[in-house]
Amino acid sequence: MATGRGGRWSVVGTALITGPTAGIGQEIARELSARGHHLILVSRDAVRLQELADELGDAEVLPADLSDQQARLPVEKAARDVDWLVNNAGYGITESFLESTVEQEQALLDVLVTSVMRLTHAALPAMIERGHGRILNVSSVAGWVPFGTYSAAKAWVTVFSEGLAAATPKDVHVTALCPGFTRTEFHERAAMDISGPGWMWLDAERVARQGVKDCDKGTVLSVPSNRYQALSLVARHAPRSLLRQVAKGRER
């Protein structure tokens, strides 16, 4: 047993984390490392993967492009015997659906949806057999609103996680972590405006810590911060026609 930064005890084992080189994924890696887990770190960026592995110590790197079916196979194999699976890898497309190419859209879905499904399918059987396991799928509050392919993919991740949580044994936990705006490289890479009011922005370390804590105790939907919990409640119960109008206003 080992304690994490939040002080909670956790069973030591192996954790596979996709997209750990920055932001929420990196902070989740640090939290699970602090709890005593051996880490398998997965990303396209081999250099930054190795830098993080060197920082954390008990970690191995598995460079892979999760949008590539063949490159994903070794990751699926590695996921078959882990205690924690963290599906965090993700990115956004700068162009709208009408401006992007179908190849861009397909690659996005391969990372945000297909890899989540396939890695989860690989990891779950051993977790169920041993009677213990944790799957933390990083989704987003964007999944509550109709903002194109990214939002649709995150809606899938959330509903997928809820369905699995209802079907798995008691000590195999599946959690969808649904943060709001979080200060990471994600928004810079997607060329998004990050000049919004300060109250909108969350700290990646706090988001990661809350997600790990909630997954460990069996919370199915983890929405860090009271303000985003309130906004999520409104979005989930608002008329769909109203949300479509909000989406239209955003595109103008």
List the predicted regions and their residue ranges:
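Conserved glycine-rich cofactor-binding loop
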Residues: 21-22
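Active-site helix of classical SDR
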Residues: 120, 153
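Residue(s) in the substrate-gating loop at a strand-loop-helix junction
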Residues: 140
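SDR active-site lid
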Residues: 159, 165-230, 241
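Conserved glycine-rich Rossmann-like NAD(P)H-binding loop of the short-chain dehydrogenase/reductase
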Residues: 35-51
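Conserved NAD(P)H cofactor-binding loop of Rossmann-fold oxidoreductase domains
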Residues: 88-93
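Substrate-binding pocket helix/loop in short-chain dehydrogenase/reductase
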Residues: 96-98, 104-109
